[in-house]
Amino acid sequence: MERFDVDAFKVFDKQWALVSAGTPEDYNTMTISWGGLGTLWSRPVATVYVKPIRYTYEYLEKNEYFTVSFFPEEYKMDLGVLGSKSGRDGDKVALTGLHAVKAENSVTFREASATLLCKKIYWQDLDPAQMPAEVIDTYYKTEAAHRMYIGEVVGIIR
């Protein structure tokens, strides 16, 4: 696999990314600012976190593959739109300058500078019983905890 060099502590939190699942004809995507890159079971992996109330959750549940796409700074406003609108309410991608394209077994965007094609190898709901009280107060007072998806990175699209 080719090399993928990023600042792992900034690429999600400061730059943001899109997690997407489905096909270019039937998919959903959402902006994420929580995630991780690493190694699990001697495989390169990407980890993302999605709440069950999000429309993208449904697509992650029914698809074996997902993508994590990174963008140049000029698309940050588009990512802001995709993080604040729901695909349940209409074609939110049409409100942006992004264009969905096929990514082998999933979907990405023509404008992405890099996309990780991921095969789901593990998922688990985060357990509030194992969280500090201030995390629950800040993130989970009124909504269910995130589901963690770990995907083996099976390809990098540039």
Language-model segments: what does each one mean?
Residues 1-32, 36-158:
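Active-site-proximal mixed secondary-structure blocks
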